[in-house]
């Protein structure tokens, strides 16, 4: 029977980086346009990469360690999780995926009821700078979901309040031809152990499982969790570790012309390999996940 739920849209991905200059340089070499630096009111900063499909990447850095530590001490889940990720993994990675929401408070109540709340909601405002140089104050509400068995990956929903529609065509016309995100890839030795967490975040309880892992559909994108066999077959990654818990691994992008992208990467001295019809660029400073590019059919 089809699910009565409506899958959420993918909003963005959180990608911890050591500093924004390195992230900007790396993503520019990959053929992305990177937006202006922006600061959060709790000590972190980002330089986002926006896409025509409404999704975006959030390379996230520490602007003020003192402000971040104070925010974490006073219950800011977003900062506390970022601090923990950097301590446990590194300053270069993929720590969370985010879905869009019209009611973050209802999401929080549902996460609490289901025993998967990641902590108290976060509400904040900050100025936004648009390509024409204008600024407006935007407000956000975040509801967090997590699993104690998975300390290095979490998710949340975001509700935007009084955020005006922005003309971002200048920021989405990427030289590499990327038009959006088609899939995000996580890993875990036994993926279905986390099907309820992923399903609730996606607002979709229909799970497609096979010998390589499982997938849950968002509105416009797919969340896939691979086991070790799936990582090796689909990404060419051999992982000898025995650790458990979800890990953010890869982002799959829709690109208009794979051959043109390959030429751009070669020109910019970016190494890529081909696996199952996709171009894959391995992580590097400023790029904490595998980036996979597939041509739009």
Regions found by a protein language model. Give the residues of each.
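Glyoxalase I/VOC metalloenzyme domain signal
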Residues: 1-10, 15-35, 51-124, 129-297
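Short glycine-biased active-site loop of nucleotidyltransferases that positions the nucleotide triphosphate
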Residues: 39-40, 47-51
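Short acidic/glycine-enriched loop/turn segments that link adjacent beta-strands
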Residues: 41-45, 275-277
